[in-house]
Design a protein with these regions (language model features):
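Nuclease catalytic cores
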Residues: 19-28, 39-43, 47, 51
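Short, low-complexity, charge-dense intrinsically disordered segments
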Residues: 1-17, 139-158
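Phosphate-binding site recognition
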Residues: 2-6, 10-18, 22, 29-37, ...
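Conserved catalytic cores of phosphodiester-cleaving nucleases, focusing on short active-site segments
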Residues: 38, 61, 81-99, 110
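A short acidic/basic microdomain associated with nuclease active sites
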Residues: 57-70
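A short, glycine/Asx- and small/polar-enriched loop/turn
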Residues: 75-79
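Short, well-ordered alpha-helices that flank and scaffold nucleotide-derived cofactor binding pockets
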Residues: 52, 56, 112
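Nucleic-acid nuclease catalytic cores
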Residues: 94-145
């Protein structure tokens, strides 16, 4: 008998998805948390629950990691990633009725600002929802401040 997990694994492996095993584990963790806690809590509660399960499974993660955004060799902003798992997958957690386009754009911008190529958006709403995103580094604009460090600002405006 094929379970949802085995179908997910087969589909991910057949398509050759980057970090298929890790993303499959994270999706499983998401559903186990949603099944146990349900919906209605703040994002921070689900983030802490995710952290507990990742630690129990000895999966390396960083929580609320500051990620700088660069422009012309200067840092122009930063964001905080909910979770970065094993340095490979950026996880964004939300709580709402449905996944919103703004959340999707947010995650894609986070991927664009990092060397991370895979992102998971988890919505702990009334119906558990997730989306997986891939943004290959060779398709991103340069983010390294040293790549455009030769460009100097005149320091003034017209």
């Amino acid at each position: 008998m094929r379970t949802a997990t085995s179908i997910l694994r087969m589909n991910a492996d057949e398509r050759g998805l980057k970090y298929a095993d890790l993303t499959e584990r994270l999706i499983g963790i998401f559903f186990s948390i949603h099944n146990e806690l349900g919906h209605g809590f703040l994002e921070s509660v689900y983030e802490q629950a995710f952290s507990v399960v990742l630690a129990e499974n000895k999966i390396f993660f960083e929580r609320q990691k500051a990620i700088p955004v660069w422009f012309h060799g200067q840092q122009v902003g930063e964001f905080r990633a909910d979770l970065i798992v094993d340095g490979k997958v950026l996880v964004e957690l939300k709580t709402g009725r449905d996944i919103e386009p703004a959340w999707e754009k947010q995650l894609l911008n986070y991927l664009r600002a990092t060397e991370i190529e895979v992102g998971l958006l988890f919505n702990f709403g009334p119906n558990a929802q997730f989306k997986r995103y891939a943004f290959e580094n060779n398709r991103k604009n340069p983010r390294n401040p040293r790549e455009s460090a030769g460009k100097k600002s005149c320091g003034g405006s017209r």
